[in-house]
Amino acid sequence: MRQRHAALALVVSAALVTAACSDPPTSGGDAARTGDGDGEGAELPDCPLDALDEAEGPAEVTLWYGGIGGPTKQTLEDIVADFNASQDRVVVTASDQGSSFAEVNRKFESAASADTSQLPDIVMLENTQMQSLVDGGLILPAEACMEAAGYDPTQIEPAVRSAFTVDDVFYPGYVNVSSQVLYYNKAHFLKAGLDPEAPPQTLEELYDVARTLRDAGVSDEPLSFKVSHAVFENWLSGEGIDVVDNANGRDGLATEATFAVPEATDTLALLRKMVDEGLINVFSNAEGSVDHFLALVTQDSSMLIETSTASTTIAQAVSGQLTAAEAGIDFDASVVDQADLVPGTGLFPGLSSPGQVHPGGAGFFIVNTSPPADQAGAWALLEFMLQPANAKAWHLNGGYLPIVKSVQDEPDVQAFWQDDLAGVLLKPAVDQLADADPDLPGPLIGPYPDFIDDLEDAMEAVLFDDAEPAGALADAQDSVTGSLQRYAED
């Protein structure tokens, strides 16, 4: 049996690298903050759409992306090819810049520092890079092009508009959105006497379920847990707790960290308790690592908190072993004899209630140093992505959540959620996005890499080295505050 598990792990490990590199996913200055992304009251720059009409030949647009692979990368390539074939005024070249969003950002920042003529016309970067992008002054807000083209931004999910808005202006032309969810093995739940259709709703319930799974001898360390700032942020934001000042950086430039609160201390203490009781297998957030996925696939663990984009990969991992009906909402106990891994997805287990998340993911940003015709051509591609048929392709084929509201009403999308294993696994994340509170869009932080490093270092100090939670968080908070203040002074 263990040999079979190992073989499956080897088959899926390459595909899982992509999901591991794509955290749900930021650019110094004073360009705050948020709104509903309708542009009302905001002063927008001109979007040079007329330049495309005046161009002597096709605009040549370069798109930089990275951190995606498999069906997600293929979806992007297909959309670009379809766009190029649909008209003769713009030719887009999509260029893969690396295995992670961080690598793309490093190349973008290097080009910006050396010679802006080396920059692409569109760059796909995580939401964590949005503040520094805006403050760097290199991005044409797509809201300006939406206004010039007559596109109604309220067609986009409110929580997405809010999360990717700065100073009441929506910046990306398209957004690939994901959120944190709970993956679990329904077969393990059944063997432990748990209801396979009732995943834990809170972190406390997750602890209780992990004890039941361990005591039943079903899995060695029931929860596979990657140290992740995104998970911790969502735990706090779900309780209305900001990680930085000025309303999480949305009312003004963040200058002070605020996450060392009792709720954060209690959360880390509970995770440490799970370590002490052998209920959790903790992994560092190393770029490209897939070990936390493999713990679920090899059945050393029964549960995993990860980004919803992993749904497609997990569905591929078990393709041929079971059907969507067997792993779906109407779970059949007989499949325990047919498959070792019966994946399910639950809402993100919060501190007090489930599904309390803010959107993560990556936006497609128009670079304003490009010639006007190329900026107009860049918008043409992104407007093409916003068409319901292409937004639907990102969901059905690329594993991202539908951001154009009308997509959810499409019959083939609803069939996907019912009949396709990937769709069954994605549906809880879709529901989370639809229910997400636009007034809790997550933080805007300029030196986001410093914030991530300090917060995750504190988590690792507690979970690996038995550091005292309150002290570790206080030290991290002081360090992040220093980074925020230096950023504000630059």
Give the residues covered by each predicted segment.
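Short, low-complexity, disordered segments immediately C-terminal to signal peptides
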Residues: 21-49
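Hinge/lid segment of periplasmic solute-binding proteins
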Residues: 46, 50, 125-179, 235-238, ...
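Extracytoplasmic "Venus flytrap"/periplasmic binding protein-like
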Residues: 82, 86-156, 191-193, 294-296, ...
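A structural signal for short loop-to-beta-strand junctions that line the ligand-binding cleft
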Residues: 113, 118-123, 149-189, 221-222, ...
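Extracytoplasmic/periplasmic solute-binding protein
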Residues: 166-175, 180, 204-256, 260, ...
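Extracytoplasmic/periplasmic substrate-recognition and gating elements
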Residues: 192, 277-280, 319-401
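Glycine-centered hinge/linker elements that transmit conformational signals in sensory
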Residues: 207-210, 252-285, 348
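Long, aromatic- and glycine/proline-rich binding clefts that accommodate carbohydrate-like moieties
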Residues: 340-346, 396-450, 454, 461
